[in-house]
Amino acid sequence: MSPPSASRRTREEVDATLQVAKLNATELLPTVHCLSFSSGTGGAATGDFCLLELEPALCQQLEAGDSFVIRGDKDEQAVLCSKDKTYDLKIADTSNMLLFIPGCKTPDQLKEEETPSAIVHTEIFGFSNNYWELRRCRPKLKKLKRLLMENTYEGPDSQKEEDASRSKYTTEDLLNHIQASEEEIMAQLQVLNACEIGGYWRILEFDYEIKLLNHVTQLVDSESWSLDRVPLTVCLQELGPLEPEEMIEHCLKCYGKRYVDKDDVYFELDADKICRVTAEMLLQNAVKFNLAEFQEVWQQSVPEGMTTRLDQLKGLALVDRNSRPEIIFLLKVDDLPEGTQDRFNSLFSLREKWTEEDITPYIQDLCGEKQTIGALLTKYSRSSMQNGIKVYNSRRLIS
């Protein structure tokens, strides 16, 4: 509703106000906004509405018709997700009162008017002393693996598949549970080598995954195929009687790169991935492994034509050069805490001092868009020299 005529300001009253404020009317736009509170004021102040500050890119997405989703369970801090990014939601207080004024025109809009109005009486719908601001954050993806590991896939003949009570998750289920954008979730599903079976996302039981990979590599060896030219059709024909064709193809996708040549589909096997998963298989049942012995067994265990290297194990295994003999043991970055401080605490509880080369694979994923490994180490550790090598230890006392 508009303010009653008795409360409307006249031109004379506006000019008098400008004079008291010592403002020159000729230096201002001719249109004057006279603000008044509407009878409905108060709804926004009591929490019926909130303001959300958007960066220009997000604003453009919203104006283009894209939607944003706020995700989080009751025990989690809410995040806002666009189609490809995740943002922390933080309340920011402001010393100035923020007014909600529907239809209010900005100075630029007023300049475009051919016949500007002398006085515009505008109602204030509501007000607020705070707003939500967005801060880009890392997607919270540890929960994704945890959910999928509740019911791993051991093959079509497993008795587990007959148990309908076991948890399974569709894409929609994961979007409802995981605090990450859809693109980030789908990318992580690829990292986890997850596959969609019967409409549900599943992680293959490690032993079953190794079994599938062995079928493929043994066939490659028996047929004397080049590692960069493994024909899909022949693989499915030869291995189909042993395992479901979709599982064979999934294995090839996980450990190879698909390409088409003369209408035939081939896969180029990734030697680094195969060497890495073979090392994981060897290390998973050993607390510690003599490094020299491990390297010998490891090289013997991979397909002919592949060469094992320790740099293939970054973020998977750690070498202790100070022990005699030198040892290697499994330390997966996936098993470390998701929070930055908790991650550093965990690493420094395992080893008091780290070189940058050793610790980098275990903190690389903590870096934000513009954050570097060096900045993280400066904030969460202290550096010193040991035998001419820079090492890092905790800033905090680790119990």
Swiss-Prot record:
InterPro entries: Dcc1. Component of the CTF18-RFC complex which consists of CTF8, CTF18, DSCC1 and the RFC complex. Interacts with CTF8 and CTF18. Interacts with DDX11. One of its GO terms (cellular component) is Ctf18 RFC-like complex. Keywords: Cell cycle, DNA replication, DNA-binding, Nucleus. It holds the Pfam family Dcc1. Loads PCNA onto primed templates regulating velocity, spacing and restart activity of replication forks. May couple DNA replication to sister chromatid cohesion through regulation of the acetylation of the cohesin subunit SMC3. One of its GO terms (biological process) is positive regulation of DNA-directed DNA polymerase activity. This is Sister chromatid cohesion protein DCC1. GO terms for molecular function: DNA binding; DNA clamp loader activity; single-stranded DNA helicase activity. It comes from Mus musculus. PANTHER family: SISTER CHROMATID COHESION PROTEIN DCC1, SISTER CHROMATID COHESION PROTEIN DCC1-RELATED. It is found in: Nucleus. Belongs to the DCC1 family.
